[in-house]
Design a protein with these regions (language model features):
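ADP-ribose/adenylate-binding Rossmann-like module
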Residues: 1-2
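Internal alpha-helical scaffold of NAD(P)-dependent oxidoreductase catalytic cores
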Residues: 5, 9-15, 31-69, 80-119, ...
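Short pre-catalytic strand/loop immediately N-terminal to key active-site residues, enriched for Gly-Thr
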Residues: 16-17, 66-72, 124-129
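Short beta-strand segments
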Residues: 18-20, 35, 156
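Glycine/serine-rich anion-binding loops at beta->alpha junctions
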Residues: 20-25, 71-81
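Acidic/polar active-site rim loop that often engages polyanionic ligands
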Residues: 26-35, 143
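NAD(P)-dependent Rossmann-like dehydrogenase/reductase catalytic/cofactor-binding core
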Residues: 107-173
Length: 173
């Protein structure tokens, strides 16, 4: 629900904060988007930040219109990672691994890669390049995944834009 709609309901003189947490907050590793209206006082803002930071990181926004992108990237983002884990596990099984073997490899690969991206000063592209040997196995896989016509860049763009559009539609309800 947008802040201006809440102001219409409870009054423009009230302190109102819109937040968008994501599921990893359940493990204290989430990220919460925050947008405050003009009535939120500095002490209220500070106290809210302390509370929300207990669940992970926070990102404060000046423009509420960015919440549709936030929802598509961060709110829905865990599902995208879960789908990747699901697909990688399934392919592992198809290549002869047991479910337990494949899933253990996948979940620890995702956990380790997540730790690398969070704790590194390198951008994701550089981390990817560091793992990719020219002509190697990763190079071959990425050539398929990054195909401009039907690869992941096109699929991810379409999917995340669809989520952002749906967020816009839902915020009008």
């Amino acid at each position: 629900i947008k802040i201006n709609r809440l102001e219409d309901i409870i009054g423009k003189d009230e302190s109102i904060v819109r937040i968008m947490p994501n599921l990893p907050a359940d493990r204290l590793k989430g990220v919460t988007a925050v947008k405050e209206n003009k009535r939120v006082e500095p002490k209220q803002s500070k106290n809210l930040a302390l509370l929300l930071e207990a669940f992970g990181e926070t990102v404060k926004f000046v423009e509420e219109r960015k919440f549709d992108a936030v929802t598509a990237i961060s709110g829905s983002g865990p599902a995208y990672i879960f789908l990747i884990a699901e697909l990688m596990t399934e392919v592992g099984i198809n290549l002869g691994l047991s479910y337990d073997e494949a899933f253990k490899l996948v979940k620890h690969t995702i956990d380790g890669a997540g730790s690398l991206i969070v704790n590194s000063s390198l951008k994701p592209q550089k981390l990817r390049e560091n793992v990719t040997s020219p002509g190697g196995t990763t190079h071959e896989a990425l050539a398929v995944m990054m195909n401009k016509d039907n690869g992941l860049p096109k699929i991810f763009s379409a999917a995340i834009k669809a989520a952002a559009q749906r967020s816009k539609e839902l915020s009008k309800v």
